[in-house]
Amino acid sequence: SSNQYLRSDFRVMGLVGAAHGASHFFHLVLPPLFPILKEEFDVSYSALALLTTCFYGVSGIAQTLAGFLVDRFGARNILLGGLTLLAASVIGYGFATEFWMLLLFSLLAGLGNSVFHPADLTILTQKVTPLRLGKAYGVHAFSGNLGWATAPIFVIYASQLFNWQTALILSGLLGLFIVLFFVIFGSDLTDTKVGSKIRIDTTVFSLASLNQNL
């Protein structure tokens, strides 16, 4: 029935939106803490900026490869793998005792982040009713901006309430919770290989995302 399709569409939008929002949230967990990290690791702001450069550089370069992996292994698997790697890397930030550890986790986080646009846009294209795809893409964009907006507030408040390590660990655990939520409620969001038409679309998504990151 139309109500069933409506519920299904909004469930898919919600799940994919939560994952996309988490990815954007993780984009901004480190920069608000730079003044603290500068003192903690006795490094310059230029060195700290390198963390962001590595994150976005790896993420942008790996986007196209992620599109091919989505075609080969299915969007759901790749999305869950990427979000798990990204969340685990943010938890790793919280356990870092040397600056090189932050750098390593930034590279891994960028790799995890690279999957999102190819994977989540493919899921939306496959699972949302065509008449509601515009709304789905709008929710997708909104969720990303919501992630950006909430990250600085969360990490600063948590770092003041606890410490910077706990703030980052809690941020990563939030991402793992979304992974678990996606596994439980998104089991039908296809692991099957996509057809040739979607494969072309996925590559376009990847190239568009690469351009956005560059």
Annotate each language-model stretch with its function:
Residues 15-35, 39-45:
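Extracytoplasmic
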